[in-house]
Design a protein with these regions (language model features):
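Boundary/linker segments flanking structured domains
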Residues: 1-198
């Protein structure tokens, strides 16, 4: 087996997938929402996917049962910088009562509008009412009772910011096994998110 040729073949396959993702990025747009729209959790009894007003943004995710790639964008680079500064201020509270684990700062240069890029394996979440991707987005929005589960946790530090976020989700035709994480890194290299290890 020629490892170099195999690596080149895999790289070409990943490049083709990434090119297709960005060729029609609007097809992957799930919703645009204002941070102030995030519903109160009412002691974990309410979640974005069941809130009568907010769920319209996310309903489609409960039909996504295969591997997914997702990212959150701000409207502008300036908004992304403001959001990242607020996240850094929240990070400074680590160790305090009520702190929830958030992603690390991305050390890459050239950051633009993207806050975070992630992937979620297909299948159904532990909660039978959620797909894996819906469960993961709930965690990022801040609606998970375990504070040690890493996520963006927007409800806990960003609800008062005057800005919109857009969620993009790529729902793949098949489950991609280990190549999913290679695609995540390639997309993150393209989008240069403000946080997450890429």
């Amino acid at each position: 087996m020629n490892i170099i040729q195999e690596q080149q073949r895999i790289n070409q396959q990943v490049n083709n997938i990434v090119t297709r993702i960005f060729k029609d990025v609007e097809a992957h747009k799930i919703c645009r929402f204002h941070l102030s729209e995030l519903p109160e959790s009412n002691n974990w009894q309410n979640h974005p996917n069941i809130d009568p007003v907010f769920k319209k943004h996310l309903d489609v995710l409960n039909h996504y049962k295969r591997d997914c790639l997702y990212w959150f964008n701000c409207d502008t680079k300036e908004d992304a910088e403001i959001l990242n500064q607020a996240l850094n201020a929240y990070r400074s509270k680590k160790g305090q009562n009520g702190y929830r684990v958030v992603p690390t700062t991305n050390k890459l240069d050239g950051k633009e509008k993207t806050i975070y890029v992630g992937v979620r394996r297909g299948n159904t979440a532990k909660n039978p009412k959620l797909t894996n991707i819906m469960g993961r987005i709930n965690q990022h929005l801040g609606y998970y009772h375990q504070p040690k589960t890493q996520g963006l946790q927007f409800l806990h530090w960003a609800k008062d910011l005057e800005m919109y976020l857009t969620l993009y989700v790529v729902h793949f035709d098949d489950n991609l096994d280990s190549i999913l994480y290679v695609i995540e890194k390639a997309v993150a290299k393209h989008l240069v998110p403000h946080c997450g290890r890429h």
